[in-house]
Amino acid sequence: MAALLKRILRRRMAEKRSGRGRMAAARTTGAQSRKTAQRSGRSEADRRRRVHGQNFLVDRETVQRFVRFADPDPGEVVLEVGAGNGAITRELARLCRRVVAYEIDRHFADRLREATAEDPRIEVVAGDFLKTSQPKVPFSVVGNIPFGNTADIVDWCLNARRLRTTTLVTQLEYARKRTGGYRRWSRLTVATWPEVEWRMGERISRRWFRPVPAVDSAVLRLERRPVPLIPPGLMHDFRDLVETGFTGKGGSLDASLRRRFPARRVAAGFRRARLEQGVVVAYVTPGQWITLFEELHGR
């Protein structure tokens, strides 16, 4: 029995020493982390922004140009995505009737709500913009958005039927690829072009953001056309044509279309759209796609 008690006591003493060692290591690690953060110059706000992929636009003149480019209707509601510190929010409120500012980080949302409490034009919502319901009246969307959520936010906007305009700060390459940069056109842009015009605005240097991102940005604007270039009842057929062309079956756009349409009609469509027979599908402009559609569907 005495031997057993001695073993138990020795084990407990060892556990206590081990626990003190872990606590000391934790204190050392915490101190090292704080020192690392201090050396890197990162504040708590910087770390919070990195968690949510946020890079706030801090240059006032750039903010003002961005809001002017957004050109919100004075009488409409504007939904702002990623309000952050409110630099864009306040500029928007000068120009429109009501701004609903969405900020997913509750810390920043609470600070912005407190800072704008006296302005009846601004409503701050702490939550995910992508989960919000669409307004039942015409509205616009404006925002300096987290780059990682760009595709989801753009999809939300394209599916919002009462949305008049969308003006976003995105990665430069995303804006270029969606607006015919390098004379190439994406499937998404072509498929939505009859109803939505895509265009790129100002390029924004990465140095105007905090934290500083790895790449430059640009302003991307989507504007829903008052009168679609193709009747709404035919949009399904148009998108189906675009899907067929971009699948690449047959080795070329011409060959892909001949799998579904008479060869003579495809040839007539190419002549009317001024397309070479071996054209790469990405180099076909949205306008040429519409011409092809009209020829192939006998319009």
UniProtKB/Swiss-Prot annotation:
It comes from the Bacteria. GO terms for molecular function: RNA binding; rRNA (adenine-N6,N6-)-dimethyltransferase activity. Pfam families: RrnaAD. Keywords: Antibiotic resistance, Methyltransferase, Plasmid, RNA-binding, S-adenosyl-L-methionine, Transferase. GO terms for biological process: response to antibiotic. It is an enzyme of class 2 (transferase). Disulfide bonds: none annotated. Its EC number is 2.1.1.-. Coiled coil: none annotated. Induction: By certain macrolide antibiotics. Residues 14-53 are annotated as: Disordered. Residues 21-31 have a biased composition (Low complexity). Gene3D superfamilies: Ribosomal RNA adenine dimethylase-like, domain 2 (1.10.8.100), Vaccinia Virus protein VP39 (3.40.50.150). The keyword Amino-acid biosynthesis does not apply. InterPro entries: KsgA/Erm (IPR001737), rRNA_Ade_diMease-like_C (IPR023165), rRNA_Ade_Mease_Trfase_CS (IPR020596), rRNA_Ade_methylase_Trfase_N (IPR020598), SAM-dependent_MTases_sf (IPR029063). S-adenosyl-L-methionine binds at N55, L57, G82, E103, D128, N144. GO terms for cellular component: cytosol. NCBIfam families: Erm23S_rRNA_broad, erm_SHROVE. Probable RNA methylase. Confers resistance to carbomycin and several other macrolides, lincomycin and vernamycin B, but not to all macrolide-lincosamide-streptogramin B antibiotics. Belongs to the class I-like SAM-binding methyltransferase superfamily. rRNA adenine N(6)-methyltransferase family. This is rRNA methyltransferase. It comes from Streptomyces thermotolerans. The gene is carB.
